[in-house]
UniProtKB/Swiss-Prot annotation:
This is RNA-binding protein MEX3A. The modification Phosphoserine is found at S338, S462. Residues 60-69 have a biased composition (Gly residues). A zinc finger (RING-type) spans 469-509. Residues 49-111, 412-461 are annotated as: Disordered. Highest levels found in fetal brain and testis. Detected also in thymus, salivary gland and uterus. The keyword tRNA-binding does not apply.
Amino acid sequence: MPSLVVSGIMERNGGFGELGCFGGSAKDRGLLEDERALQLALDQLCLLGLGEPPAPTAGEDGGGGGGGAPAQPAAPPQPAPPPPPAAPPAAPTAAPAAQTPQPPTAPKGASDAKLCALYKEAELRLKGSSNTTECVPVPTSEHVAEIVGRQGCKIKALRAKTNTYIKTPVRGEEPVFMVTGRREDVATARREIISAAEHFSMIRASRNKSGAAFGVAPALPGQVTIRVRVPYRVVGLVVGPKGATIKRIQQQTNTYIITPSRDRDPVFEITGAPGNVERAREEIETHIAVRTGKILEYNNENDFLAGSPDAAIDSRYSDAWRVHQPGCKPLSTFRQNSLGCIGECGVDSGFEAPRLGEQGGDFGYGGYLFPGYGVGKQDVYYGVAETSPPLWAGQENATPTSVLFSSASSSSSSSAKARAGPPGAHRSPATSAGPELAGLPRRPPGEPLQGFSKLGGGGLRSPGGGRDCMVCFESEVTAALVPCGHNLFCMECAVRICERTDPECPVCHITATQAIRIFS
Protein backbone atom coordinates (compact mmCIF):
# COMPACT_ATOMS: atom_id res chain seq x y z
CA MET A 1 0.00 0.00 0.00
CA PRO A 2 2.74 2.61 0.75
CA SER A 3 4.36 1.84 -2.60
CA LEU A 4 1.14 2.63 -4.47
CA VAL A 5 0.78 5.92 -2.64
CA VAL A 6 4.35 6.89 -3.48
CA SER A 7 3.91 5.99 -7.17
CA GLY A 8 0.69 8.03 -7.39
CA ILE A 9 2.39 11.02 -5.85
CA MET A 10 5.26 10.75 -8.30
CA GLU A 11 2.95 10.52 -11.31
CA ARG A 12 0.92 13.57 -10.22
CA ASN A 13 3.98 15.67 -9.59
CA GLY A 14 6.19 14.43 -12.42
CA GLY A 15 5.72 17.39 -14.79
CA PHE A 16 6.06 19.95 -12.02
CA GLY A 17 9.32 18.33 -11.00
CA GLU A 18 10.70 18.95 -14.39
CA LEU A 19 9.57 22.54 -14.17
CA GLY A 20 11.04 22.75 -10.70
CA CYS A 21 14.35 21.57 -11.96
CA PHE A 22 14.20 24.38 -14.42
CA GLY A 23 15.31 26.71 -11.66
CA GLY A 24 18.28 24.49 -10.90
CA SER A 25 17.86 24.78 -7.03
CA ALA A 26 18.79 21.64 -4.98
CA LYS A 27 17.40 23.24 -1.81
CA ASP A 28 13.93 23.42 -3.30
CA ARG A 29 14.08 19.77 -4.29
CA GLY A 30 15.04 18.82 -0.72
CA LEU A 31 12.07 20.70 0.73
CA LEU A 32 9.71 18.98 -1.66
CA GLU A 33 11.06 15.56 -0.70
CA ASP A 34 10.59 16.30 3.00
CA GLU A 35 7.08 17.45 2.36
CA ARG A 36 6.28 14.30 0.40
CA ALA A 37 7.68 12.10 3.16
CA LEU A 38 5.56 13.84 5.78
CA GLN A 39 2.46 13.53 3.65
CA LEU A 40 3.22 9.85 3.15
CA ALA A 41 3.40 9.30 6.89
CA LEU A 42 0.10 11.07 7.42
CA ASP A 43 -1.55 8.98 4.69
CA GLN A 44 -0.35 5.80 6.40
CA LEU A 45 -1.82 6.97 9.70
CA CYS A 46 -5.13 7.63 7.97
CA LEU A 47 -5.10 4.13 6.49
CA LEU A 48 -4.48 2.66 9.96
CA GLY A 49 -7.49 4.60 11.33
CA LEU A 50 -5.53 6.70 13.87
CA GLY A 51 -6.44 10.00 12.28
CA GLU A 52 -8.96 11.70 9.99
CA PRO A 53 -8.21 12.34 6.31
CA PRO A 54 -6.33 15.63 5.98
CA ALA A 55 -8.40 18.60 4.80
CA PRO A 56 -7.31 20.45 1.65
CA THR A 57 -5.17 23.48 2.33
CA ALA A 58 -5.86 26.99 1.15
CA GLY A 59 -2.75 27.35 -1.00
CA GLU A 60 -3.48 24.40 -3.22
CA ASP A 61 -6.02 26.30 -5.39
CA GLY A 62 -3.31 28.39 -7.02
CA GLY A 63 -0.67 27.71 -9.53
CA GLY A 64 0.08 24.06 -9.00
CA GLY A 65 2.96 23.76 -6.55
CA GLY A 66 4.48 20.36 -5.93
CA GLY A 67 3.29 20.31 -2.30
CA GLY A 68 -0.43 20.74 -3.09
CA ALA A 69 -0.69 18.01 -5.69
CA PRO A 70 -1.23 14.99 -3.32
CA ALA A 71 -4.14 16.66 -1.52
CA GLN A 72 -5.84 17.92 -4.75
CA PRO A 73 -6.04 15.35 -7.54
CA ALA A 74 -7.44 17.88 -10.11
CA ALA A 75 -4.18 19.80 -10.24
CA PRO A 76 -2.66 18.05 -13.33
CA PRO A 77 -5.48 19.06 -15.81
CA GLN A 78 -4.55 22.74 -15.18
CA PRO A 79 -1.06 23.14 -16.58
CA ALA A 80 0.52 26.47 -16.01
CA PRO A 81 1.45 28.54 -19.09
CA PRO A 82 5.17 28.78 -19.80
CA PRO A 83 6.47 31.70 -17.76
CA PRO A 84 8.85 34.34 -19.07
CA PRO A 85 12.53 33.57 -18.73
CA ALA A 86 13.02 35.83 -15.69
CA ALA A 87 9.87 34.87 -13.74
CA PRO A 88 10.26 31.09 -13.24
CA PRO A 89 12.82 31.24 -10.42
CA ALA A 90 10.46 33.31 -8.20
CA ALA A 91 7.30 31.24 -8.65
CA PRO A 92 8.70 27.86 -7.54
CA THR A 93 10.53 29.51 -4.71
CA ALA A 94 7.51 31.39 -3.37
CA ALA A 95 5.08 28.52 -3.74
CA PRO A 96 7.05 26.07 -1.60
CA ALA A 97 7.78 28.80 0.89
CA ALA A 98 4.09 29.58 1.28
CA GLN A 99 2.90 26.00 1.28
CA THR A 100 5.63 24.28 3.28
CA PRO A 101 4.33 24.96 6.86
CA GLN A 102 0.66 24.42 6.06
CA PRO A 103 0.31 20.69 5.26
CA PRO A 104 1.88 19.37 8.51
CA THR A 105 -0.11 21.64 10.83
CA ALA A 106 -3.73 20.54 10.60
CA PRO A 107 -3.28 16.77 10.11
CA LYS A 108 -0.49 16.60 12.66
CA GLY A 109 -2.61 18.40 15.27
CA ALA A 110 -5.52 15.98 14.74
CA SER A 111 -3.26 12.92 15.11
CA ASP A 112 -1.61 14.38 18.20
CA ALA A 113 -5.01 14.99 19.78
CA LYS A 114 -6.01 11.39 19.04
CA LEU A 115 -2.79 10.06 20.53
CA CYS A 116 -3.16 12.29 23.61
CA ALA A 117 -6.69 10.97 24.16
CA LEU A 118 -5.42 7.39 24.01
CA TYR A 119 -2.58 8.16 26.43
CA LYS A 120 -4.88 9.86 28.92
CA GLU A 121 -7.30 6.94 28.85
CA ALA A 122 -4.49 4.48 29.53
CA GLU A 123 -3.18 6.67 32.33
CA LEU A 124 -6.60 6.83 33.98
CA ARG A 125 -6.96 3.05 33.71
CA LEU A 126 -3.55 2.61 35.32
CA LYS A 127 -4.41 4.99 38.13
CA GLY A 128 -7.72 3.25 38.75
CA SER A 129 -6.06 -0.17 39.04
CA SER A 130 -3.35 0.94 41.50
CA ASN A 131 -3.86 0.17 45.24
CA THR A 132 -3.31 2.44 48.20
CA THR A 133 -2.92 1.78 51.95
CA GLU A 134 -4.34 4.00 54.67
CA CYS A 135 -4.22 3.89 58.48
CA VAL A 136 -7.52 4.27 60.36
CA PRO A 137 -7.02 4.78 64.13
CA VAL A 138 -9.72 4.10 66.73
CA PRO A 139 -9.82 5.27 70.37
CA THR A 140 -9.21 2.07 72.37
CA SER A 141 -8.72 -1.67 72.06
CA GLU A 142 -12.33 -2.12 73.15
CA HIS A 143 -13.36 -0.34 69.96
CA VAL A 144 -11.17 -2.77 68.02
CA ALA A 145 -12.95 -5.74 69.58
CA GLU A 146 -16.34 -4.21 68.82
CA ILE A 147 -15.44 -3.48 65.17
CA VAL A 148 -13.86 -6.90 64.59
CA GLY A 149 -16.79 -8.74 66.16
CA ARG A 150 -17.00 -12.27 67.47
CA GLN A 151 -14.53 -14.46 65.59
CA GLY A 152 -14.00 -11.60 63.13
CA CYS A 153 -17.50 -11.74 61.66
CA LYS A 154 -17.93 -7.97 61.38
CA ILE A 155 -14.53 -7.23 59.87
CA LYS A 156 -14.98 -10.04 57.34
CA ALA A 157 -18.29 -8.57 56.24
CA LEU A 158 -16.68 -5.13 55.91
CA ARG A 159 -13.89 -6.57 53.76
CA ALA A 160 -16.39 -8.19 51.43
CA LYS A 161 -18.56 -5.07 51.29
CA THR A 162 -15.74 -2.65 50.43
CA ASN A 163 -13.56 -5.07 48.43
CA THR A 164 -10.52 -4.14 50.53
CA TYR A 165 -8.00 -5.89 52.76
CA ILE A 166 -8.21 -4.71 56.36
CA LYS A 167 -5.43 -5.65 58.79
CA THR A 168 -6.62 -5.61 62.39
CA PRO A 169 -4.27 -4.70 65.26
CA VAL A 170 -3.27 -7.47 67.64
CA ARG A 171 -3.19 -7.32 71.42
CA GLY A 172 -0.54 -4.91 72.66
CA GLU A 173 -0.35 -2.86 69.46
CA GLU A 174 -1.81 0.55 68.81
CA PRO A 175 -5.53 0.42 67.89
CA VAL A 176 -4.99 1.24 64.21
CA PHE A 177 -6.55 -0.55 61.23
CA MET A 178 -4.56 -0.84 57.96
CA VAL A 179 -6.84 -0.67 54.91
CA THR A 180 -5.49 -1.60 51.45
CA GLY A 181 -7.37 -1.34 48.16
CA ARG A 182 -8.50 1.10 45.52
CA ARG A 183 -8.71 4.68 46.61
CA GLU A 184 -12.49 4.92 46.59
CA ASP A 185 -12.86 1.53 48.32
CA VAL A 186 -10.39 2.55 51.01
CA ALA A 187 -12.35 5.75 51.61
CA THR A 188 -15.56 3.73 51.99
CA ALA A 189 -13.94 1.32 54.46
CA ARG A 190 -12.52 4.24 56.44
CA ARG A 191 -15.95 5.82 56.77
CA GLU A 192 -17.44 2.51 57.93
CA ILE A 193 -14.76 1.97 60.59
CA ILE A 194 -15.01 5.51 61.94
CA SER A 195 -18.81 5.28 62.02
CA ALA A 196 -18.68 2.00 63.97
CA ALA A 197 -16.19 3.44 66.46
CA GLU A 198 -18.35 6.52 67.06
CA HIS A 199 -21.43 4.34 67.53
CA PHE A 200 -19.66 2.23 70.16
CA SER A 201 -18.41 5.35 71.93
CA MET A 202 -21.96 6.68 72.14
CA ILE A 203 -23.25 3.40 73.55
CA ARG A 204 -20.54 3.28 76.20
CA ALA A 205 -21.08 6.92 77.13
CA SER A 206 -24.82 6.41 77.59
CA ARG A 207 -24.14 3.28 79.64
CA ASN A 208 -21.74 5.14 81.91
CA LYS A 209 -24.19 7.99 82.41
CA SER A 210 -27.02 5.72 83.45
CA GLY A 211 -24.81 3.34 85.44
CA ALA A 212 -24.11 3.34 89.14
CA ALA A 213 -20.74 3.98 90.70
CA PHE A 214 -19.69 0.37 90.19
CA GLY A 215 -21.19 -1.12 87.07
CA VAL A 216 -24.43 -0.97 85.19
CA ALA A 217 -27.63 0.19 86.82
CA PRO A 218 -30.72 -1.96 86.64
CA ALA A 219 -32.47 -1.71 83.32
CA LEU A 220 -35.92 -2.16 84.83
CA PRO A 221 -37.51 -1.00 88.07
CA GLY A 222 -37.16 -3.49 90.87
CA GLN A 223 -33.86 -4.92 89.64
CA VAL A 224 -30.63 -4.78 91.60
CA THR A 225 -26.94 -5.09 90.80
CA ILE A 226 -24.49 -6.80 93.12
CA ARG A 227 -20.79 -7.55 92.85
CA VAL A 228 -19.35 -10.96 93.67
CA ARG A 229 -15.60 -10.97 94.18
CA VAL A 230 -13.72 -14.20 93.50
CA PRO A 231 -10.01 -15.13 93.50
CA TYR A 232 -8.09 -14.33 90.35
CA ARG A 233 -7.31 -17.96 89.65
CA VAL A 234 -10.96 -19.04 89.45
CA VAL A 235 -12.26 -16.34 87.09
CA GLY A 236 -11.72 -18.61 84.09
CA LEU A 237 -13.28 -21.49 85.99
CA VAL A 238 -16.47 -19.50 86.58
CA VAL A 239 -16.61 -18.25 82.99
CA GLY A 240 -16.04 -21.74 81.58
CA PRO A 241 -14.95 -22.81 78.10
CA LYS A 242 -16.13 -20.15 75.65
CA GLY A 243 -18.32 -18.71 78.41
CA ALA A 244 -20.46 -21.85 78.71
CA THR A 245 -20.62 -21.88 82.51
CA ILE A 246 -21.52 -18.22 82.98
CA LYS A 247 -24.12 -18.46 80.19
CA ARG A 248 -25.71 -21.43 81.88
CA ILE A 249 -25.90 -19.53 85.17
CA GLN A 250 -27.48 -16.54 83.43
CA GLN A 251 -30.10 -18.72 81.76
CA GLN A 252 -30.94 -20.66 84.90
CA THR A 253 -31.24 -17.58 87.11
CA ASN A 254 -32.63 -15.14 84.52
CA THR A 255 -29.93 -12.56 85.29
CA TYR A 256 -27.33 -10.57 83.39
CA ILE A 257 -23.73 -11.14 84.52
CA ILE A 258 -20.77 -9.00 83.46
CA THR A 259 -17.48 -10.89 83.63
CA PRO A 260 -14.33 -9.03 84.74
CA SER A 261 -11.72 -8.17 82.14
CA ARG A 262 -8.06 -9.06 82.45
CA ASP A 263 -6.95 -5.65 83.64
CA ARG A 264 -9.64 -5.19 86.31
CA ASP A 265 -10.53 -6.66 89.67
CA PRO A 266 -11.97 -10.19 89.65
CA VAL A 267 -15.51 -9.04 90.34
CA PHE A 268 -18.64 -10.40 88.67
CA GLU A 269 -21.50 -7.89 88.36
CA ILE A 270 -24.92 -9.54 88.53
CA THR A 271 -28.08 -7.65 87.55
CA GLY A 272 -31.63 -8.89 87.96
CA ALA A 273 -34.43 -9.38 90.42
CA PRO A 274 -33.28 -9.69 94.05
CA GLY A 275 -34.14 -13.38 94.26
CA ASN A 276 -32.54 -14.19 90.92
CA VAL A 277 -29.42 -12.25 91.82
CA GLU A 278 -29.08 -14.25 95.03
CA ARG A 279 -29.50 -17.50 93.13
CA ALA A 280 -26.82 -16.49 90.63
CA ARG A 281 -24.41 -15.70 93.46
CA GLU A 282 -25.16 -19.09 94.99
CA GLU A 283 -24.49 -20.83 91.69
CA ILE A 284 -21.12 -19.12 91.36
CA GLU A 285 -20.13 -20.05 94.91
CA THR A 286 -21.25 -23.64 94.48
CA HIS A 287 -19.38 -24.02 91.21
CA ILE A 288 -16.17 -22.78 92.83
CA ALA A 289 -16.63 -25.05 95.86
CA VAL A 290 -17.33 -28.15 93.78
CA ARG A 291 -14.50 -27.64 91.30
CA THR A 292 -11.78 -26.53 93.71
CA GLY A 293 -12.80 -28.28 96.93
CA LYS A 294 -12.61 -24.98 98.79
CA ILE A 295 -15.35 -22.75 100.06
CA LEU A 296 -15.50 -19.15 98.88
CA GLU A 297 -14.61 -17.05 101.90
CA TYR A 298 -16.20 -13.66 102.08
CA ASN A 299 -13.76 -11.87 104.39
CA ASN A 300 -15.51 -8.64 103.41
CA GLU A 301 -14.46 -9.18 99.81
CA ASN A 302 -18.01 -9.09 98.54
CA ASP A 303 -19.41 -5.61 98.20
CA PHE A 304 -22.86 -7.10 98.53
CA LEU A 305 -22.47 -7.76 102.26
CA ALA A 306 -24.19 -5.19 104.43
CA GLY A 307 -21.70 -5.64 107.25
CA SER A 308 -18.64 -4.76 105.21
CA PRO A 309 -16.20 -2.58 107.19
CA ASP A 310 -15.13 -0.76 104.07
CA ALA A 311 -17.47 2.17 104.37
CA ALA A 312 -16.01 3.93 101.38
CA ILE A 313 -16.91 1.14 99.03
CA ASP A 314 -20.20 0.34 100.70
CA SER A 315 -21.35 3.94 100.66
CA ARG A 316 -21.06 4.10 96.89
CA TYR A 317 -24.02 1.83 96.55
CA SER A 318 -27.38 3.38 96.90
CA ASP A 319 -29.62 1.80 99.48
CA ALA A 320 -32.19 1.33 96.77
CA TRP A 321 -29.93 -1.17 95.00
CA ARG A 322 -28.79 -3.18 98.00
CA VAL A 323 -30.54 -6.43 98.86
CA HIS A 324 -31.19 -6.44 102.58
CA GLN A 325 -30.99 -9.83 104.18
CA PRO A 326 -31.29 -10.91 107.76
CA GLY A 327 -27.97 -12.69 107.61
CA CYS A 328 -25.34 -14.01 105.27
CA LYS A 329 -24.96 -17.69 104.71
CA PRO A 330 -21.44 -19.09 104.51
CA LEU A 331 -22.35 -21.17 101.49
CA SER A 332 -25.90 -21.00 100.33
CA THR A 333 -25.96 -24.34 98.55
CA PHE A 334 -25.51 -26.11 101.85
CA ARG A 335 -28.92 -25.02 103.05
CA GLN A 336 -30.62 -28.09 101.60
CA ASN A 337 -29.05 -30.52 104.05
CA SER A 338 -27.85 -29.83 107.51
CA LEU A 339 -24.62 -31.80 107.35
CA GLY A 340 -22.92 -29.75 104.67
CA CYS A 341 -22.81 -32.27 101.84
CA ILE A 342 -23.08 -30.83 98.36
CA GLY A 343 -26.07 -32.12 96.45
CA GLU A 344 -28.56 -34.70 97.67
CA CYS A 345 -27.31 -36.86 100.52
CA GLY A 346 -29.00 -39.62 102.42
CA VAL A 347 -29.43 -37.79 105.72
CA ASP A 348 -32.34 -38.06 108.06
CA SER A 349 -34.64 -35.10 108.33
CA GLY A 350 -34.10 -35.10 112.06
CA PHE A 351 -30.65 -33.58 111.63
CA GLU A 352 -31.91 -30.04 111.78
CA ALA A 353 -29.19 -27.53 112.56
CA PRO A 354 -29.81 -25.01 115.32
CA ARG A 355 -29.57 -21.31 114.78
CA LEU A 356 -26.21 -19.62 114.72
CA GLY A 357 -26.84 -18.11 118.12
CA GLU A 358 -26.92 -21.59 119.64
CA GLN A 359 -23.57 -22.62 118.23
CA GLY A 360 -20.78 -22.32 120.69
CA GLY A 361 -17.84 -22.98 118.41
CA ASP A 362 -15.70 -20.56 116.48
CA PHE A 363 -15.97 -20.65 112.72
CA GLY A 364 -12.42 -20.00 111.66
CA TYR A 365 -10.40 -21.95 109.07
CA GLY A 366 -12.52 -21.35 106.02
CA GLY A 367 -15.38 -20.17 108.17
CA TYR A 368 -17.58 -23.21 107.82
CA LEU A 369 -16.47 -26.80 107.71
CA PHE A 370 -14.26 -26.94 110.79
CA PRO A 371 -15.59 -24.90 113.71
CA GLY A 372 -13.04 -23.94 116.27
CA TYR A 373 -10.07 -24.58 114.04
CA GLY A 374 -7.40 -21.92 114.37
CA VAL A 375 -8.20 -20.70 117.90
CA GLY A 376 -7.73 -23.35 120.50
CA LYS A 377 -7.03 -25.83 117.65
CA GLN A 378 -8.29 -29.12 119.01
CA ASP A 379 -10.40 -27.84 121.88
CA VAL A 380 -13.72 -27.94 120.09
CA TYR A 381 -13.04 -31.40 118.77
CA TYR A 382 -12.42 -32.64 122.28
CA GLY A 383 -15.55 -31.25 123.85
CA VAL A 384 -14.40 -27.87 125.21
CA ALA A 385 -16.82 -25.04 124.62
CA GLU A 386 -15.13 -21.84 123.45
CA THR A 387 -15.85 -18.57 125.19
CA SER A 388 -15.23 -16.45 122.09
CA PRO A 389 -18.38 -15.45 120.23
CA PRO A 390 -19.00 -16.97 116.82
CA LEU A 391 -18.11 -15.10 113.68
CA TRP A 392 -21.73 -14.36 112.87
CA ALA A 393 -22.71 -13.19 116.33
CA GLY A 394 -25.69 -10.89 116.27
CA GLN A 395 -27.27 -12.64 113.31
CA GLU A 396 -29.50 -14.92 115.30
CA ASN A 397 -32.39 -14.14 113.00
CA ALA A 398 -30.64 -15.77 110.10
CA THR A 399 -32.03 -18.83 108.43
CA PRO A 400 -30.90 -22.23 109.71
CA THR A 401 -27.42 -22.92 108.42
CA SER A 402 -25.76 -26.26 108.08
CA VAL A 403 -22.77 -26.94 110.31
CA LEU A 404 -20.54 -29.91 110.55
CA PHE A 405 -20.17 -30.06 114.30
CA SER A 406 -22.06 -28.71 117.24
CA SER A 407 -20.48 -27.42 120.39
CA ALA A 408 -21.13 -30.72 122.08
CA SER A 409 -18.51 -33.32 121.20
CA SER A 410 -18.66 -37.06 120.87
CA SER A 411 -17.46 -39.49 123.47
CA SER A 412 -14.80 -40.81 121.13
CA SER A 413 -13.27 -37.34 120.93
CA SER A 414 -12.96 -37.25 124.68
CA SER A 415 -11.35 -40.66 124.82
CA ALA A 416 -9.01 -39.75 121.98
CA LYS A 417 -7.96 -36.64 123.86
CA ALA A 418 -7.26 -38.75 126.91
CA ARG A 419 -5.01 -41.06 124.85
CA ALA A 420 -3.26 -38.20 123.08
CA GLY A 421 -1.20 -37.00 126.03
CA PRO A 422 -1.19 -35.58 129.54
CA PRO A 423 -3.76 -33.01 130.53
CA GLY A 424 -1.13 -30.29 130.56
CA ALA A 425 -0.66 -30.34 126.81
CA HIS A 426 -4.20 -29.07 126.21
CA ARG A 427 -7.11 -28.30 128.41
CA SER A 428 -8.39 -31.47 129.96
CA PRO A 429 -11.98 -32.47 129.25
CA ALA A 430 -12.47 -33.49 132.87
CA THR A 431 -11.40 -30.14 134.26
CA SER A 432 -12.75 -27.69 131.70
CA ALA A 433 -15.76 -29.34 130.13
CA GLY A 434 -17.67 -29.99 133.30
CA PRO A 435 -18.53 -33.08 135.30
CA GLU A 436 -21.10 -34.29 132.84
CA LEU A 437 -18.35 -35.19 130.32
CA ALA A 438 -15.94 -36.84 132.74
CA GLY A 439 -17.34 -40.34 132.80
CA LEU A 440 -18.51 -40.75 129.23
CA PRO A 441 -17.78 -44.20 127.85
CA ARG A 442 -15.69 -44.74 124.76
CA ARG A 443 -17.67 -44.77 121.50
CA PRO A 444 -17.33 -48.11 119.71
CA PRO A 445 -16.88 -48.16 115.91
CA GLY A 446 -20.11 -47.72 113.97
CA GLU A 447 -21.91 -45.89 116.77
CA PRO A 448 -23.44 -42.57 115.70
CA LEU A 449 -21.93 -39.40 117.06
CA GLN A 450 -23.61 -38.29 120.25
CA GLY A 451 -22.86 -34.71 119.40
CA PHE A 452 -25.90 -34.73 117.12
CA SER A 453 -28.25 -35.92 119.85
CA LYS A 454 -29.25 -32.37 120.64
CA LEU A 455 -30.27 -31.94 117.02
CA GLY A 456 -32.74 -34.81 117.11
CA GLY A 457 -32.90 -37.88 114.93
CA GLY A 458 -31.45 -41.30 115.36
CA GLY A 459 -27.96 -40.80 113.94
CA LEU A 460 -26.05 -41.32 110.75
CA ARG A 461 -26.73 -44.28 108.57
CA SER A 462 -23.89 -46.76 108.80
CA PRO A 463 -22.07 -46.98 105.45
CA GLY A 464 -22.07 -50.33 103.79
CA GLY A 465 -19.01 -52.48 104.46
CA GLY A 466 -17.73 -50.11 107.17
CA ARG A 467 -13.99 -49.62 106.80
CA ASP A 468 -11.64 -48.74 109.63
CA CYS A 469 -9.37 -45.72 109.65
CA MET A 470 -5.91 -46.57 108.34
CA VAL A 471 -4.30 -44.43 111.06
CA CYS A 472 -6.02 -45.47 114.29
CA PHE A 473 -7.73 -48.67 113.05
CA GLU A 474 -10.55 -48.01 115.52
CA SER A 475 -13.07 -45.59 114.01
CA GLU A 476 -14.83 -45.88 110.71
CA VAL A 477 -13.75 -44.01 107.61
CA THR A 478 -15.70 -40.76 107.61
CA ALA A 479 -13.28 -38.17 106.18
CA ALA A 480 -11.16 -37.46 103.13
CA LEU A 481 -8.17 -35.22 102.51
CA VAL A 482 -8.11 -32.39 100.01
CA PRO A 483 -6.78 -32.18 97.32
CA CYS A 484 -5.71 -35.81 96.89
CA GLY A 485 -9.16 -37.15 97.85
CA HIS A 486 -8.07 -40.26 99.77
CA ASN A 487 -11.02 -41.24 101.99
CA LEU A 488 -9.24 -43.64 104.33
CA PHE A 489 -9.40 -41.79 107.65
CA CYS A 490 -11.76 -40.96 110.45
CA MET A 491 -12.51 -37.32 111.08
CA GLU A 492 -10.24 -37.06 114.14
CA CYS A 493 -7.22 -38.50 112.36
CA ALA A 494 -7.83 -36.40 109.25
CA VAL A 495 -7.90 -33.23 111.36
CA ARG A 496 -4.69 -34.25 113.13
CA ILE A 497 -3.01 -34.76 109.77
CA CYS A 498 -4.00 -31.26 108.68
CA GLU A 499 -2.75 -29.79 111.97
CA ARG A 500 0.78 -31.06 111.48
CA THR A 501 3.63 -28.72 110.68
CA ASP A 502 4.10 -30.52 107.38
CA PRO A 503 0.64 -31.90 106.59
CA GLU A 504 0.70 -34.59 103.94
CA CYS A 505 -1.40 -37.57 102.99
CA PRO A 506 0.04 -40.85 104.37
CA VAL A 507 -0.87 -42.60 101.14
CA CYS A 508 0.39 -40.34 98.35
CA HIS A 509 2.45 -37.85 100.43
CA ILE A 510 0.73 -34.88 98.78
CA THR A 511 0.33 -31.79 100.94
CA ALA A 512 -3.12 -31.78 102.53
CA THR A 513 -4.91 -28.46 102.77
CA GLN A 514 -8.07 -29.51 104.58
CA ALA A 515 -10.19 -32.45 105.62
CA ILE A 516 -13.81 -32.92 104.69
CA ARG A 517 -16.44 -35.28 106.05
CA ILE A 518 -17.89 -37.74 103.58
CA PHE A 519 -21.27 -39.41 103.60
CA SER A 520 -22.32 -42.53 101.80
